[in-house]
């Protein structure tokens, strides 16, 4: 039986991946600049600093990289504070874990202020012992550190722990550590679905299948 759950947020608990594809485009629109159609794809594969530099050079924006980063982050923060919705019936697995005394933590690449305002609005904070972010931990989810820290808080061993994720590279890290995985489909990672399926102990196309997950973790 599962003794601890680790949750990704974007594309897993929240239906929020789209803002990361659109934020730079919306920011440029506010500056009166029309962005290229595939800007979201370009930005998705860059760090914030790299993305800001790309925007400054490509669109001849007369602002510092920090000012551009801050502007894009304001767009993203506003989305989390006002709009970011739950992803389908994700609340069902949180309720199940709480009722069965299974501790939960978050492991996310999104910075904590954005997660915190979304969780406050949606009343999700009560479910989690701690929120771990890659920024605060100092390494990405392609490294084991964030999952090791999560398990320390949960008090679990890898084979007692389940990770809920839509991202293939995070699942790959967890699987190599011996952590069980639930793969959740998200349209933002269409191209990675074969890998997500191959890494998942349980794969679901939507949270309508939450009972399938509950059966697996019992």
Walk through the language-model features, giving the residues of each.
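Active-site neighborhood of HAD-like aspartate-dependent phosphohydrolases
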Residues: 1-41, 176
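Asp-based, Mg2+/Mn2+-dependent phosphohydrolase catalytic module
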Residues: 1-3, 95-98, 112, 116-218
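Conserved phosphate-coupling serine/threonine residues in phosphotransfer and NTP-handling enzymes
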Residues: 12, 108-110, 185
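Conserved SAM-binding loop
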Residues: 13, 104, 163-164
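Conserved donor sugar-nucleotide recognition element shared by glycan-biosynthetic enzymes
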Residues: 20, 48, 86, 143
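Helix-loop "lid/cap" segments that line or gate small-molecule binding pockets
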Residues: 25-28, 47-62, 118, 150-151
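Metal-dependent phosphoesterase signature
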Residues: 54-92
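Short, acidic loop-to-helix structural element flanking the phosphoryl-transfer center
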Residues: 78-106, 116, 144
């Amino acid at each position: 039986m599962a003794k601890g759950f680790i949750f990704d947020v974007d594309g897993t608990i929240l239906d929020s991946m789209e803002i990361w594809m659109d934020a730079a485009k919306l920011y440029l629109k506010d500056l009166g600049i029309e962005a290229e159609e595939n800007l979201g794809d370009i930005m998705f594969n860059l760090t914030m600093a790299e993305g800001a530099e790309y925007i400054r050079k490509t669109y001849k924006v007369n602002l510092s990289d920090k000012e551009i980063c801050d502007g894009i982050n304001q767009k993203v923060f506003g989305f989390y504070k006002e709009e970011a919705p739950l992803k389908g019936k994700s609340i069902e697995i949180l309720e199940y874990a709480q009722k069965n005394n299974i501790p939960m933590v978050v492991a996310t690449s999104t910075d904590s202020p954005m997660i915190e305002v979304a969780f406050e609005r949606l009343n999700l904070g009560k479910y989690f012992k701690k929120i771990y972010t890659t920024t605060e931990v100092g390494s990405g989810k392609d490294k084991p550190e964030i999952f090791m820290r999560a398990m320390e808080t949960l008090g679990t061993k890898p084979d007692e722990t389940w990770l809920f994720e839509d991202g293939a590279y995070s699942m790959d890290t967890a699987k190599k550590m011996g952590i069980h995985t639930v793969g959740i489909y998200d349209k933002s990672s269409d191209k990675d679905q074969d890998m997500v399926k191959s890494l998942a102990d349980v794969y679901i196309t939507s949270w309508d299948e939450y009972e399938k997950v509950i059966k697996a973790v019992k």
